[in-house]
């Protein structure tokens, strides 16, 4: 398939705010894609490169050849070029990578160059996130969307699922092919996510099931982990399905000692002090990211688990939470997250207050009769924090003045628009320490795309957790809302911009 066809569809998707129209355009493209190209096409319309990292930075895209007159690039050749770039290492690799990029862009038309720039920078912004692409795969294959989503949950990726569904002779064969994707110990599953509520009472009201007892978990201030155990072999994955097994030997040893031969557990890992209180999140995040043996030895991470997806040959994804917790208690023992089972909101509120006093983030209120809805913000999990917080994306940043002179300080905050792009909600420099100012100055200069007299404009990649006292109507920002007394809590390097809170979530919090 020509890259020009993908670029044309990307433009069509960007040109409409209608989710149905976006879905139809992508489905039409997928129907036309040859089987060998489907995985590449799916990645490109979702705004991603299959290689994830190619070594090309934004500055590499500033001085490239002009566009070609006629389209000639095949998506398979483009994918092979990016794969070759990703494999380059050692002396001379930067020069070789730049030469390969120049050759690729010289063969691309203006429309194709725009697509390639968006893929390399992660800034395609046409509103075709993975969930929409999965729905388009379902349309193209003529199968129910839940079948596709379930297969992608187990596969941990959209590409193989799309290829299997679209290669089938018809809808019945496609459903059969999709049913072949099952939970496999050793292969990461997309994690279930929680919706939000402003308080415990509201969380109870949102859950299905009426007066049935719920499970109230302490929400730990750590990093999300998913562990897979097959005998003595243990693998540890992050929220984004990155394999960090080699960086966390202490977690591997803890899981290896659990009394089960095969396990898939969902949980959190965090560093704790001598009194058992969580250390600052940035320390936990830095520890999980380091490959430095001395740093790793100086601070250990402790795993705590809140769900069990598989135990000794028994898949539990479709089992109700109460059954999964029974198995979890039997296999994970002291590594189980503290929880309360109750139908009394007042008791849950007391539990929430105690968790916050102990330095934790809050609680997650869970319906006990629901399955594990991997890859989705399921209706069965509702998180509650002691303050209003949002995970937003930094869109630009201003140079500081006074004590903050010389540092990039005042950050512009945006919520994700499901239709594409970001909606600005305000600015803040509140809550920033000197250490944070120094770190973000270096980080944001790496993300710079342009600048004017006052601000440095960024690739929208850095997620930041913001606390605020409320939301107010505002004509100053395009979303019609602004944050009141916004302040920085921490940078969330464990989250991508695609996982940031949406403008719809913000409007719900504002009561709109």
Curated annotation (Swiss-Prot):
ATP binds at residues 217, 224, 239, 268, 306, 377, 383. NCBIfam families: dnl1, PRK03180.1. The gene is lig. The active site is at 219 (n6-amp-lysine intermediate). Its EC number is 6.5.1.1. Keywords: ATP-binding, Cell cycle, Cell division, DNA damage, DNA recombination, DNA repair, DNA replication, Ligase, Magnesium, Metal-binding, Nucleotide-binding. This is Probable DNA ligase. Belongs to the ATP-dependent DNA ligase family. CDD domains: Adenylation_DNA_ligase_Arch_LigB, OBF_DNA_ligase_Arch_LigB. GO terms for molecular function: ATP binding; DNA binding; DNA ligase (ATP) activity; metal ion binding. Its cofactor is Mg(2+). It catalyses: ATP + (deoxyribonucleotide)n-3'-hydroxyl + 5'-phospho-(deoxyribonucleotide)m = (deoxyribonucleotide)n+m + AMP + diphosphate. DNA ligase that seals nicks in double-stranded DNA during DNA replication, DNA recombination and DNA repair. GO terms for biological process: cell division; DNA biosynthetic process; DNA recombination; DNA repair; DNA replication. The keyword Cell division applies.
């Amino acid at each position: 398939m020509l890259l020009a066809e993908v670029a044309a569809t990307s433009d069509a998707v960007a040109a409409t705010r209608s989710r149905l129209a976006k879905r139809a355009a992508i489905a039409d493209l997928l129907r036309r894609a040859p089987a060998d190209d489907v995985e590449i096409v799916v990645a490109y319309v979702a705004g991603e490169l299959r290689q994830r990292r190619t070594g090309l930075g934004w500055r590499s895209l500033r001085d490239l050849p002009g566009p070609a007159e006629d389209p000639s690039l095949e998506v398979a050749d483009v994918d092979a070029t990016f794969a070759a770039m990703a494999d380059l290492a050692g002396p001379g690799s930067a020069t070789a990578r730049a030469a390969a990029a120049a050759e690729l862009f010289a063969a691309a038309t203006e429309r194709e160059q725009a697509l390639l720039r968006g893929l390399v920078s992660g800034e395609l912004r046409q509103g075709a996130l993975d969930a929409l692409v999965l729905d388009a795969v379902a349309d193209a294959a003529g199968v129910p969307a839940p079948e596709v989503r379930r297969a992608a949950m187990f596969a941990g990726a959209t590409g193989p699922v799309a290829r299997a569904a679209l290669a089938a002779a018809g809808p019945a064969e496609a459903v059969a092919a999709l049913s072949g994707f099952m939970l496999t110990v050793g292969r990461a599953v997309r994690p279930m996510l929680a919706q939000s509520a402003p308080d415990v009472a509201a969380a109870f009201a949102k859950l299905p099931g009426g007066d049935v007892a719920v499970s109230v978990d302490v929400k730990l201030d750590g990093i999300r982990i998913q562990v897979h155990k097959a005998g003595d072999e243990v693998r540890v994955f992050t929220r984004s399905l990155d394999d960090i097994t080699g960086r966390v030997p202490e977690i591997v040893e803890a899981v290896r000692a659990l009394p089960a031969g095969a396990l898939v557990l969902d949980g959190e890992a965090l560093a704790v002090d001598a009194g058992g209180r969580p250390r600052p999140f940035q320390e936990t995040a830095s520890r999980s990211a380091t490959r430095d043996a001395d740093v790793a030895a100086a601070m250990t991470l402790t795993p705590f688990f809140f769900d069990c997806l598989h135990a000794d040959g028994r898949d539990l994804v479709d089992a109700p939470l109460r059954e999964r917790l029974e198995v979890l208690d039997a296999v994970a023992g002291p590594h189980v997250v503290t929880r309360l089972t109750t139908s009394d909101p007042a008791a849950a509120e007391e539990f929430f207050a105690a968790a916050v006093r102990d330095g934790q983030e809050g609680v997650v209120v869970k319906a006990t009769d629901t399955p594990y809805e991997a890859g989705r913000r399921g209706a069965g999990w509702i998180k509650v924090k002691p303050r209003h917080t949002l995970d937003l994306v930094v869109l630009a940043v201003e140079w500081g003045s006074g004590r903050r002179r010389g540092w990039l300080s005042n950050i512009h905050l945006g919520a994700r628009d499901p239709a594409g792009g970001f909606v600005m909600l305000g600015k803040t420099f509140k809550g920033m320490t000197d250490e944070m100012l120094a770190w973000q100055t270096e980080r944001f200069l790496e993300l710079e795309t342009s600048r004017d007299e006052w601000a440095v404009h960024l690739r929208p990649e850095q997620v930041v957790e913001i606390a605020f006292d409320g939301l107010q109507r505002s004509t100053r920002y395009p979303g019609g809302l602004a944050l009141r007394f916004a302040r920085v809590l921490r940078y969330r390097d464990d989250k991508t911009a695609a996982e940031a809170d949406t403008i719809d979530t913000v409007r719900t919090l504002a009561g709109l």
